[in-house]
């Protein structure tokens, strides 16, 4: 297979000149263009991204760092980012951070060293200071699901605290007073904020509950099962549950049924995210909508705009969560 060096040798020009011709640079003279095109045709040479990038200084790559691409939540984020990238003739390079400092650091540095035109970063383990350092090196780096002081105009986030507060307030309005919280065991700000929202709503309603009503688990179905089992083992008079996400809610529903109880007749359950599973489990899950697709689109558009102009085209919003009513909550007044 012919290389750009082969083309340059046959055409009698430099590799840089071949790159200029490939990128249709006005700096390429007519004679050089004819020689290079003839050599490319003779060698059946197909320009690759690396050759184009030599002159354009653009890799046509958007880097995206997520927690774990196998998680449906992050799968939705990647898909939405890819749709925007495709519209701009770009491709994605994806890294996994797993909510671990070293993995997030390695992932960000891989994307930066790969000469990505822009980056959308979902990082929870690294400090604000370290992320500000990376952002200073790359003006087209945008952060999603996090607000970093000093970089607010490059952050696309959701009000997690408000979302959990909405869920708990809804249960309180339905007459529930003994509301358990299934929190994530991951030490990230999402967990802290959602737990704070739960406590905010209880405090506003004058509802005092001991910490025994809070159980933590991995933010997956199995974690929801473990946390719900821990709550039930205490024989607390729980009538409702606020879960960290829809998968923990699904695990909780499984344990409720396994213990001879029924949802929502005995225990109401609310999730968070409005992921696909919320629409298909039984009962269909009342939840908080997390517009991750819209947020990822906004973040990618912002990152690409910064890459092309280095100026802020718009101030990204902090998205407001929305309560989605389905069938997993029952009023205590009925």
What spans do the regions from the language model cover?
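N-terminal helix-turn-helix DNA-binding module of bacterial transcription factors
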Residues: 1-58, 333
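Hinge/beta->alpha junction and helix N-cap segments in small-molecule ligand-binding domains
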Residues: 49, 66-76, 94-103, 146, ...
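Short acidic capping loops at alpha-helix termini that bridge into adjacent secondary structure
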Residues: 177-178, 209-213, 262-268
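Flexible loop/turn connectors
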Residues: 229-240, 244-334
């Amino acid at each position: 297979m012919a290389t750009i060096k082969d083309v340059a040798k046959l055409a009698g020009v430099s590799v840089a000149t071949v790159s200029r011709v490939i990128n249709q640079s006005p700096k390429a003279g007519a004679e050089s263009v004819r020689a290079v095109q003839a050599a490319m045709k003779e060698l059946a040479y197909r320009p690759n991204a690396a050759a184009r990038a030599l002159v354009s200084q653009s890799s046509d790559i958007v880097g995206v760092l997520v927690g774990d691409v196998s998680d449906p939540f992050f799968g939705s984020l990647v898909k939405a980012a890819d749709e925007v990238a495709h519209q701009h003739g770009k491709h994605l390079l994806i890294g996994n951070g797993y909510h671990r400092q070293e993995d997030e650091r390695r992932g960000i540095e891989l994307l930066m060293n790969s000469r990505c035109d822009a980056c959308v970063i979902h990082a929870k383990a690294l400090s604000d200071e370290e992320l500000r350092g990376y952002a200073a090196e790359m003006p087209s780096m945008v952060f999603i699901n996090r607000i970093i002081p000093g970089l607010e105009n490059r952050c696309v986030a959701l009000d997690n605290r408000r979302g959990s507060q909405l869920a708990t307030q809804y249960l309180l309005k339905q007459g529930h007073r003994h509301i358990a919280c299934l929190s994530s065991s991951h030490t990230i700000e999402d967990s802290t904020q959602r737990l704070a929202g739960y406590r905010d709503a209880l405090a506003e309603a004058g509802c005092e509950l001991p910490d025994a009503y809070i159980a933590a688990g991995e933010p997956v179905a199995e974690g929801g099962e473990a946390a719900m089992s821990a709550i039930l083992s205490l024989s607390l008079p729980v009538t409702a549950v606020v879960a960290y996400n829809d998968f923990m809610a699904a695990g909780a529903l499984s344990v409720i049924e396994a213990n001879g109880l029924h949802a929502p007749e005995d225990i109401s359950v609310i999730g968070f995210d409005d992921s696909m599973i919320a629409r298909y489990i039984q009962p269909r899950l009342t939840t908080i909508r997390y517009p991750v697709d819209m947020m990822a689109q906004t973040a990618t558009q912002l990152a690409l705009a910064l890459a092309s102009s280095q100026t802020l085209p718009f101030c990204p919003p902090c998205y407001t969560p929305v309560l989605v009513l389905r069938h997993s909550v029952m009023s205590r007044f009925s």
